[in-house]
Amino acid sequence: VTRQSGAVKSKDDLGNNNRFNLELHVGGSNFWNNTSFEWFHGSNAGVETSGGWADAYAGAKSANVYRIHNMGHYIFNSYFGVEHLISYAYGTGYDKEYKSGSVYDAGKDYVEYSVEKEKLFKAVVRPTVKLTKMTKLVAELGAYKQIVDTFEGDKITENGQKYTLAYCITPDTGNLLWGPAIKFFVTYIHADKHSDDYGRQVVGGITSYDNAYQDVNHNTMFGVQAEGSW
């Protein structure tokens, strides 16, 4: 059995799950690139379009997710390099048991929706500039957009962006993009969620909560981070 959202799900609820990958690796002395084409089927399919871990969703046991994923790095010279990630995923075949989230309706009350199909695009770019033998400046720019079509006939759009600037102290910047470092960083995060014509059903004689909008969230953070990767 598997525990899901506080309830115990049997293997019959979850169904089989499969993952198939086709990958292309290309590399050289100053670059590396990986492109993968992925197909997820069954109860692990719902999570891949929302960026989660290997959870299992009973409502996704007949679903399919198709994803193309590209990541890599390029080192232009000993002072400048860039890492990147681009991903697009499309999921369909969920049943109404699969719940993906909630939005505010016009009455400022949360309403759950059931996913029929969903799309997710995300991209991250991370340029690094060497300043001295032991210091470097790293920027990270990331964004995503997720579009969900619901069984209720509505469209939920969610966007998010994250911008980080970090000053790094490292034993040796000869390893430009990686290596242990102490990072002093500032990060700005922004996200919003919008539903088009949500809640057209009649509830207590009231119809149509058109163009409901969940409040925009944003935050700025400062911090220090120790990193030990090579």
Report the location of each language-model feature.
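Extended hydrophobic secondary-structure segments that form protein cores and membrane-embedded regions
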Residues: V1-R3, S36, P180-I189
